[in-house]
Amino acid sequence: MRVLLAVDESENSHRVVQYVGSLLRRTPDVAVTLFHVLKPMPRELLEHGGSENPAAEAELSVQLRNEQEAWIRKERESECHVLREACETLTQSGFDMSHVTLTFGHEDDIARNILEEARSGHHETIVVGRHGTSRIKRIFGGGVTDQLLRDAKGFAIWVVE
């Protein structure tokens, strides 16, 4: 069984990791991917102004890619503590860390990021915590968890309170 466990810095996320670790620690053939979505990339790194000169355009494109890669590296370094803490929690619960993979996403749409990672990693199960949602969000279906429940066809979804 391949499980994608979406984590963030919240206390609720910490409880979800504890729950999964204690529930699955003795389950044979289980692989867990800890997945954390970085904050959105700044707008100025999404595209450059362009140029009518093909050589200048190519140079601008290379420069933009380099700046994007540098931003992603910096964000991963500053956010790696989220995955490190989740690993520590799994270890404390007795989970075999040789079956754990760590990965990041970095798009604006967190739910879409989670689904893309679940599909590309061939996960069968997605585990998320339910964050407190306002009455308005509940009525109109807002929030990452609600979006996953609506859009995640072909996956088992565990929502841990």
Annotate each PLM feature.
Residues R25, R119-S120, R150-D151:
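Solvent-exposed polar/charged
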Residues G50-E52, E116-R119, V144-T145:
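Short, hinge-like loop/turn segments at secondary-structure boundaries
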Residues R150-E161:
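Short, flexible loop segments at boundaries between secondary-structure elements
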Residues D8, H131-T133, E161:
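Histidine-centered beta-alpha loop that forms part of the nucleotide-sugar donor binding/catalytic region
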Residues D108-D109, T125-R150:
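Glycine-rich, Arg-bearing micro-motifs that act as flexible, cationic patches
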Residues M1-E67, H99:
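Small/aliphatic-rich secondary-structure junction motif
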